[in-house]
Amino acid sequence: MKTFQLTGTPRAEFGKKAAKAIRKEDQIPAVLYGGKGEGVNFIVSQDAVRNLIYSPEIFLVELTVEGSGSYKAILKEIQFHPVTDRIIHIDFLQVTDEKPVVMEVPVVLTGHAEGVKAGGKLSLEMRKLKVKALYSEIPEKLDIDVSDLQLGKTIQVGELHFEGLTLMNAKNAVVCAVKLTRAARGAAVKKQ
Protein backbone atom coordinates (compact mmCIF):
# COMPACT_ATOMS: atom_id res chain seq x y z
CA MET A 1 0.00 0.00 0.00
CA LYS A 2 1.30 3.47 -0.88
CA THR A 3 1.98 5.97 1.88
CA PHE A 4 0.87 9.59 2.08
CA GLN A 5 2.59 12.16 4.32
CA LEU A 6 0.23 14.56 6.10
CA THR A 7 0.88 17.20 8.74
CA GLY A 8 -1.77 18.71 10.97
CA THR A 9 -1.95 21.32 13.71
CA PRO A 10 -3.77 20.70 16.99
CA ARG A 11 -7.28 22.07 17.27
CA ALA A 12 -7.90 24.28 20.29
CA GLU A 13 -11.51 25.38 19.83
CA PHE A 14 -14.52 23.13 19.20
CA GLY A 15 -18.12 23.58 18.15
CA LYS A 16 -20.01 24.81 15.11
CA LYS A 17 -18.71 28.39 15.26
CA ALA A 18 -15.08 27.30 15.55
CA ALA A 19 -15.48 24.78 12.71
CA LYS A 20 -16.92 27.47 10.41
CA ALA A 21 -14.00 29.77 11.20
CA ILE A 22 -11.55 26.96 10.38
CA ARG A 23 -13.26 26.26 7.04
CA LYS A 24 -13.19 29.97 6.07
CA GLU A 25 -9.38 29.80 6.22
CA ASP A 26 -9.34 26.85 3.72
CA GLN A 27 -8.62 24.43 6.55
CA ILE A 28 -10.50 21.23 7.38
CA PRO A 29 -11.29 19.98 10.90
CA ALA A 30 -10.24 16.35 11.35
CA VAL A 31 -10.09 13.67 14.02
CA LEU A 32 -7.91 10.61 14.52
CA TYR A 33 -9.42 7.79 16.56
CA GLY A 34 -8.85 4.09 17.15
CA GLY A 35 -5.74 4.35 19.27
CA LYS A 36 -5.34 4.15 23.01
CA GLY A 37 -7.24 6.88 24.82
CA GLU A 38 -9.28 9.69 23.33
CA GLY A 39 -9.23 10.85 19.73
CA VAL A 40 -6.81 13.50 18.49
CA ASN A 41 -8.54 16.58 17.06
CA PHE A 42 -6.51 18.57 14.54
CA ILE A 43 -6.69 20.77 11.45
CA VAL A 44 -5.31 20.05 7.96
CA SER A 45 -5.13 22.33 4.94
CA GLN A 46 -7.47 21.74 2.02
CA ASP A 47 -4.53 21.61 -0.42
CA ALA A 48 -2.65 19.02 1.65
CA VAL A 49 -5.44 16.43 1.46
CA ARG A 50 -6.61 17.04 -2.12
CA ASN A 51 -4.39 14.28 -3.62
CA LEU A 52 -5.40 11.89 -0.84
CA ILE A 53 -9.14 12.34 -1.25
CA TYR A 54 -9.58 12.80 -5.01
CA SER A 55 -7.60 9.71 -5.99
CA PRO A 56 -8.88 6.25 -6.94
CA GLU A 57 -5.95 4.72 -5.03
CA ILE A 58 -5.82 3.85 -1.34
CA PHE A 59 -3.10 5.09 0.99
CA LEU A 60 -1.63 4.48 4.40
CA VAL A 61 -1.44 7.98 5.89
CA GLU A 62 1.65 8.83 7.92
CA LEU A 63 0.08 11.54 10.02
CA THR A 64 2.12 14.00 12.07
CA VAL A 65 0.20 16.25 14.46
CA GLU A 66 2.34 19.01 15.97
CA GLY A 67 2.69 18.42 19.70
CA SER A 68 0.91 15.04 19.66
CA GLY A 69 3.27 12.81 17.69
CA SER A 70 3.19 10.62 14.58
CA TYR A 71 0.58 8.02 13.68
CA LYS A 72 -0.19 5.49 10.97
CA ALA A 73 -3.79 5.84 9.83
CA ILE A 74 -6.25 5.23 7.04
CA LEU A 75 -8.93 7.55 5.71
CA LYS A 76 -12.17 6.36 7.31
CA GLU A 77 -14.82 8.95 6.45
CA ILE A 78 -15.11 12.23 4.58
CA GLN A 79 -18.06 14.57 5.08
CA PHE A 80 -19.00 16.87 2.20
CA HIS A 81 -21.24 19.93 2.24
CA PRO A 82 -24.56 18.91 0.61
CA VAL A 83 -24.74 21.95 -1.69
CA THR A 84 -21.18 23.14 -2.39
CA ASP A 85 -19.45 19.71 -2.19
CA ARG A 86 -16.66 21.22 -0.08
CA ILE A 87 -15.04 18.94 2.47
CA ILE A 88 -16.32 19.82 5.94
CA HIS A 89 -14.75 17.07 8.08
CA ILE A 90 -12.36 14.11 7.83
CA ASP A 91 -12.10 11.05 10.09
CA PHE A 92 -8.89 9.02 10.24
CA LEU A 93 -8.59 5.58 11.84
CA GLN A 94 -5.30 4.72 13.53
CA VAL A 95 -4.00 1.31 12.45
CA THR A 96 -1.80 -1.20 14.24
CA ASP A 97 -0.03 -4.36 13.12
CA GLU A 98 -2.26 -6.68 15.17
CA LYS A 99 -5.78 -5.27 14.69
CA PRO A 100 -7.64 -5.83 11.37
CA VAL A 101 -9.24 -2.87 9.59
CA VAL A 102 -12.16 -2.60 7.17
CA MET A 103 -11.63 -0.48 4.07
CA GLU A 104 -12.65 -0.24 0.43
CA VAL A 105 -10.14 -1.43 -2.18
CA PRO A 106 -10.40 -0.57 -5.91
CA VAL A 107 -11.32 -3.36 -8.36
CA VAL A 108 -9.34 -3.82 -11.59
CA LEU A 109 -10.62 -6.16 -14.30
CA THR A 110 -7.94 -8.07 -16.24
CA GLY A 111 -8.16 -10.15 -19.39
CA HIS A 112 -10.47 -9.96 -22.41
CA ALA A 113 -13.90 -11.48 -21.72
CA GLU A 114 -15.27 -14.14 -24.09
CA GLY A 115 -18.65 -12.41 -24.00
CA VAL A 116 -17.11 -9.18 -25.29
CA LYS A 117 -15.63 -11.08 -28.25
CA ALA A 118 -19.17 -12.35 -28.95
CA GLY A 119 -20.55 -8.78 -29.12
CA GLY A 120 -21.34 -8.04 -25.47
CA LYS A 121 -20.28 -5.13 -23.30
CA LEU A 122 -18.26 -5.57 -20.09
CA SER A 123 -19.80 -3.58 -17.25
CA LEU A 124 -18.03 -2.93 -13.93
CA GLU A 125 -20.84 -2.72 -11.35
CA MET A 126 -18.69 -2.25 -8.20
CA ARG A 127 -15.62 -0.04 -8.44
CA LYS A 128 -14.52 -0.90 -4.89
CA LEU A 129 -14.97 -3.88 -2.58
CA LYS A 130 -15.04 -3.64 1.21
CA VAL A 131 -12.37 -5.91 2.73
CA LYS A 132 -11.27 -6.77 6.26
CA ALA A 133 -7.63 -7.61 6.97
CA LEU A 134 -4.50 -6.40 8.70
CA TYR A 135 -3.50 -3.16 6.99
CA SER A 136 -0.15 -4.70 5.98
CA GLU A 137 -1.99 -7.39 3.96
CA ILE A 138 -4.38 -5.07 2.10
CA PRO A 139 -3.35 -4.73 -1.56
CA GLU A 140 -3.46 -1.50 -3.59
CA LYS A 141 -6.05 -3.06 -5.90
CA LEU A 142 -8.01 -6.28 -6.37
CA ASP A 143 -7.31 -7.91 -9.75
CA ILE A 144 -10.22 -9.94 -11.13
CA ASP A 145 -9.67 -12.06 -14.25
CA VAL A 146 -12.66 -11.87 -16.62
CA SER A 147 -11.21 -13.98 -19.48
CA ASP A 148 -13.79 -16.79 -19.07
CA LEU A 149 -16.80 -14.50 -18.59
CA GLN A 150 -19.48 -15.37 -21.19
CA LEU A 151 -22.26 -13.24 -22.65
CA GLY A 152 -25.02 -12.63 -20.08
CA LYS A 153 -22.92 -13.94 -17.17
CA THR A 154 -21.79 -12.16 -14.00
CA ILE A 155 -19.11 -12.39 -11.34
CA GLN A 156 -20.51 -12.09 -7.82
CA VAL A 157 -18.68 -11.31 -4.58
CA GLY A 158 -19.27 -14.87 -3.32
CA GLU A 159 -17.24 -16.28 -6.23
CA LEU A 160 -14.13 -14.25 -5.34
CA HIS A 161 -11.36 -15.36 -2.99
CA PHE A 162 -8.29 -13.36 -2.00
CA GLU A 163 -5.67 -14.75 0.38
CA GLY A 164 -5.59 -13.01 3.76
CA LEU A 165 -8.69 -10.89 3.00
CA THR A 166 -12.30 -11.24 4.10
CA LEU A 167 -14.79 -9.66 1.69
CA MET A 168 -17.48 -7.73 3.59
CA ASN A 169 -19.89 -7.06 0.69
CA ALA A 170 -23.05 -9.13 0.20
CA LYS A 171 -22.22 -12.51 -1.38
CA ASN A 172 -24.80 -12.08 -4.15
CA ALA A 173 -23.68 -8.54 -5.11
CA VAL A 174 -22.60 -8.35 -8.77
CA VAL A 175 -19.03 -7.09 -9.30
CA CYS A 176 -19.03 -7.18 -13.12
CA ALA A 177 -21.17 -8.51 -15.96
CA VAL A 178 -21.09 -8.98 -19.72
CA LYS A 179 -24.31 -7.51 -21.07
CA LEU A 180 -25.89 -7.89 -24.48
CA THR A 181 -25.68 -4.62 -26.44
CA ARG A 182 -28.59 -3.14 -28.39
CA ALA A 183 -26.75 -3.73 -31.67
CA ALA A 184 -26.19 -7.40 -30.83
CA ARG A 185 -29.83 -7.73 -29.75
CA GLY A 186 -31.00 -6.16 -33.02
CA ALA A 187 -28.78 -8.49 -35.06
CA ALA A 188 -30.21 -11.51 -33.21
CA VAL A 189 -33.78 -10.38 -33.96
CA LYS A 190 -33.00 -9.86 -37.67
CA LYS A 191 -31.62 -13.42 -37.93
CA GLN A 192 -34.94 -14.81 -36.74
From Swiss-Prot:
A Pfam family of this chain: Ribosomal_L25p
Gene Ontology biological process terms, A to Z: translation
Superkingdom: Bacteria
GO CC field: cytosolic large ribosomal subunit
InterPro entries: Rbsml_bL25/Gln-tRNA_synth_N, Ribosomal_bL25/Gln-tRNA_synth, Ribosomal_bL25_b-dom, Ribosomal_bL25_C, Ribosomal_bL25_long, Ribosomal_L25_dom, Ribosomal_uL5_bac-type
Gene Ontology molecular function terms on file: 5S rRNA binding; structural constituent of ribosome
Keywords for this protein: Ribonucleoprotein, Ribosomal protein, RNA-binding, rRNA-binding
Disulphide-bonded residues: none
Functional description taken from the UniProt entry: This is one of the proteins that binds to the 5S RNA in the ribosome where it forms part of the central protuberance.
PANTHER family: RIBOSOMAL PROTEIN L25/GLN-TRNA SYNTHETASE, ANTI-CODON-BINDING DOMAIN-CONTAINING PROTEIN, RIBOSOMAL PROTEIN L25_GLN-TRNA SYNTHETASE, ANTI-CODON-BINDING DOMAIN-CONTAINING PROTEIN
Quaternary structure note: Part of the 50S ribosomal subunit; part of the 5S rRNA/L5/L18/L25 subcomplex. Contacts the 5S rRNA. Binds to the 5S rRNA independently of L5 and L18.
Similarity comment: Belongs to the bacterial ribosomal protein bL25 family. CTC subfamily.
Name assigned to this protein: Large ribosomal subunit protein bL25
Native species: Porphyromonas gingivalis (strain ATCC BAA-308 / W83)
